[in-house]
């Protein structure tokens, strides 16, 4: 059976956040993080529907008043002890699209132009044999564990950071994958995901108060090199 190109964008927002309380509705731009993300997605071409999945009545009200689908998340899927893959199975049951795009409110610098680019690239890459698309940013820095250096040598063998092996930071900004494959993988992207590279501003991801303050500063700046 041939898949359609219908895409459901899912904004997953939990009411409780241990590291940064109420992080999904913190003030951002001209509104709050959740509403900011909804307004960004409304400008994206090619979306069949936008869903906010939350256990928070306050967040669902924001989504509903903004004119998107607001679906109350069952209590068991708001519990962090429940495997992420089980929550994804539930998501696959509530979406109409043949493809799911994960769109986190905590990635506020992922702008409409980036979503549009990702969607076009995603369908191209599916034809080339990739199974999904994720956003990553290049990551070249010195890494250590408790035993010492992981990706560099000390002494005369030391290299400048730009000479280190290229690693990739998975940003959580955009994930795109076929709905039925997500159900099969119990994950929101697959083993042959195409890595769409984005810059540090676009990769901003809010997990704690430091991330939040940095994201506000990055959003306020004019991006000198947007991924277009």
What are these regions (language model features)?
Residues 57-101, 113-117:
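Short phosphate-binding loop-to-helix
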Residues 3-53:
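N-terminal glycine-rich phosphate-binding loop and ensuing alpha1 helix
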């Amino acid at each position: 059976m041939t898949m359609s190109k219908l895409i459901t964008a899912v904004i997953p927002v939990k009411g409780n956040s241990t590291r940064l309380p109420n992080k999904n509705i913190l003030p951002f731009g001209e509104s709050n993080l959740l509403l900011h993300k909804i307004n960004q997605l409304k400008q994206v071409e090619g979306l069949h529907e936008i869903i906010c999945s939350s256990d928070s009545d306050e967040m669902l009200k924001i989504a509903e008043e903004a004119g998107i689908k607001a679906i109350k998340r069952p209590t068991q899927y708001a519990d962090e002890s429940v495997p992420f893959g089980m929550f994804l199975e539930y998501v696959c049951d509530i979406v109409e699209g043949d493809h799911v795009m994960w769109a986190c409110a905590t990635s506020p610098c992922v702008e409409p132009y980036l979503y549009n680019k990702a969607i076009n690239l995603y369908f191209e890459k599916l034809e080339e044999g990739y199974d999904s698309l994720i956003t990553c940013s290049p990551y070249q820095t010195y890494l250590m564990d408790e035993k010492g250096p992981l990706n560099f040598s000390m002494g005369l063998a030391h290299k400048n950071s730009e000479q280190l092996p290229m690693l990739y930071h998975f940003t959580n900004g955009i994930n795109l994958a076929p709905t039925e494959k997500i159900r099969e993988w119990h994950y929101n992207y697959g083993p042959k995901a195409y890595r769409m590279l984005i810059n540090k501003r676009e990769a901003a991801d809010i997990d704690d108060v430091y991330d939040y303050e940095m994201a506000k500063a990055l959003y306020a700046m004019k991006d000198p090199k947007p991924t277009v």
